[in-house]
């Protein structure tokens, strides 16, 4: 059974409302073998800075009685790497970035 799940969020039309959480999905490369990225309405990529950023010093994660505290600090390879490597990878899928 096919259902029309198309929706608009902030003026952007998505084929469905299923998107990834910012930061936890990176650029999706690590998940391409696990799920069909074409089924997602959008991929919300990890934050990208102009220059490569190492993030915060360790320890970055602390366990609490109710879960984890995360302070990775937006570690990323920078905008040039994102444009040259991640965007071409993501464009092969029929989903919004």
Go through the PLM ranges and name each one.
Residues 1-96:
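N-terminal capping/small domains of soluble enzymes
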């Amino acid at each position: 059974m096919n259902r029309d799940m198309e929706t608009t969020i902030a003026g952007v039309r998505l084929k469905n409302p299923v998107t990834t959480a910012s930061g936890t999905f990176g650029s999706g490369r690590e998940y391409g073998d696990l799920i069909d990225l074409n089924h997602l309405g959008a991929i919300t990529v990890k934050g990208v800075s102009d220059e490569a950023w190492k993030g915060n010093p360790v320890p970055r994660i602390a366990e609490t009685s109710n879960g984890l505290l995360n302070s990775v600090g937006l570690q990323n390879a920078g905008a040039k790497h994102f444009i040259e490597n991640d965007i071409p990878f993501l464009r092969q899928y029929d989903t919004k970035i």
